[in-house]
């Protein structure tokens, strides 16, 4: 029989499986999904899809098409997401209904997704969403795809501040709003703001806020030009930021799916001033944070020592760095 998805699937709790680290890539923003780069990939190598109308054969088509471009574990994860998120079939459906005939609209949808993956477009942009802290966030070109390391930072904040009475938090450079919204759903009695310079990012963040039932206030602000208002002084308990931190000299080690699709304004800083955004946030933080207020950053590991020195020089105490799951100095924190 020909079937169509008729149920709401249960979404995976993380993004596209685990994003795989590359030994030559120092930063999580260098990658989203591990891929080998093929600047000229012949579409003629893709199996003919028109006769692959049975679910089991369609799975083979997806995996064979992506073979040699993605590692096997990523191909399996992508296949699962294509079936589950794009087509509405659970892993159990795919197994139990392996001989089921798909309708033409689903076959066409899968063909289009595979073609985009062969052009190295991130699957999160293709599907229109990514997973963060167990929730589904809308993403698209112009908004950085959330990384697992950023989720680590958010969990670190929740763990370290679970016994504090937080009244006000700012997420500077909020992007899709994933940090701010996740914190809002955890710290229920706290006013949380998400700042960004990009109207496009703020639009997506606002939509995520509504979809997830959060209560974040999103504000368009340029942290490099921002002067706190009198009523804001010393009223924030916590500031968090995952600002741009990659220098142009690192571009050679980055994957095309990041360089060609994700917003450079969310990735790169000047070669001669890699702490540009951190310094600006630290200085604004001295005016916004109350006494004992906390500052949290996701950082570039190669500038971890410079970050610590900068925070000390700006008058912060309890400065420290923490490693991510891959053992890199990925997070910095300090107390006003």
Each predicted region: which residue ranges?
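N-terminal auxiliary segments of SAM/dcSAM-dependent transferases
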Residues: 55-127
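N-terminal helix-forming leader/targeting segments
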Residues: 1-10, 17
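Short, charge-rich patches within N-terminal targeting peptides
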Residues: 26-30
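Short polybasic linear motifs
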Residues: 22-23, 42
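Short, positively charged and aromatic/hydrophobic N-terminal segments
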Residues: 44, 50-51
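S-adenosylmethionine
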Residues: 189-191, 195-336
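SAM-dependent Rossmann-like transferase core, predominantly class I methyltransferases
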Residues: 111-207, 333
């Amino acid at each position: 029989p020909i079937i169509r998805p008729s149920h709401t699937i249960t979404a995976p709790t993380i993004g596209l499986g685990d994003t795989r680290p590359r030994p030559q890539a120092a930063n999580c923003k260098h990658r989203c999904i591990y891929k080998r780069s093929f600047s000229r990939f012949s579409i003629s190598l893709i199996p003919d899809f028109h006769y692959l109308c049975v679910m089991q054969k369609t799975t083979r088509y997806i995996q064979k098409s992506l073979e040699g471009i993605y590692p096997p574990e990523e191909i399996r994860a992508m296949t699962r997401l294509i079936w589950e998120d794009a087509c509405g079939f659970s892993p159990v459906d795919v197994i139990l209904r392996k001989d089921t005939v798909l309708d033409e609209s689903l076959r066409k949808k899968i063909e289009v997704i595979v073609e985009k993956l062969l052009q190295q477009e991130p699957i999160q942009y293709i599907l229109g969403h990514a997973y963060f802290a167990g929730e589904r966030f809308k993403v698209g070109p112009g908004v950085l795809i959330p990384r697992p390391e950023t989720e680590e930072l958010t969990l670190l904040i929740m763990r370290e501040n679970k016994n504090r009475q937080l009244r006000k938090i700012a997420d500077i450079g909020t992007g899709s709003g994933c940090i701010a919204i996740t914190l809002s759903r955890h710290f229920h009695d706290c006013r949380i703001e998400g700042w960004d310079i990009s109207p496009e990012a703020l639009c997506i963040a606002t939509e995520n806020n509504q979809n997830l039932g959060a209560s974040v206030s999103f504000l368009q602000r340029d942290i490099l030009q921002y002067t706190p208002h009198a009523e804001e002084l010393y009223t924030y308990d916590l500031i968090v930021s995952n600002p741009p931190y990659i220098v142009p000299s690192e571009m050679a080690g980055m994957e095309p799916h990041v360089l060609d699709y994700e917003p450079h304004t969310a990735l790169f800083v000047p070669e001669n001033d890699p702490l540009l955004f951190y310094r600006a946030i630290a200085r604004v933080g001295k005016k916004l944070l109350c006494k004992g207020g906390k500052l949290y950053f996701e950082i570039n590991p190669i500038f971890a020592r410079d970050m610590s020195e900068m925070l000390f020089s700006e008058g912060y105490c309890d400065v420290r760095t923490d490693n991510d799951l891959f053992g890199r100095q990925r997070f910095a924190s300090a107390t006003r």
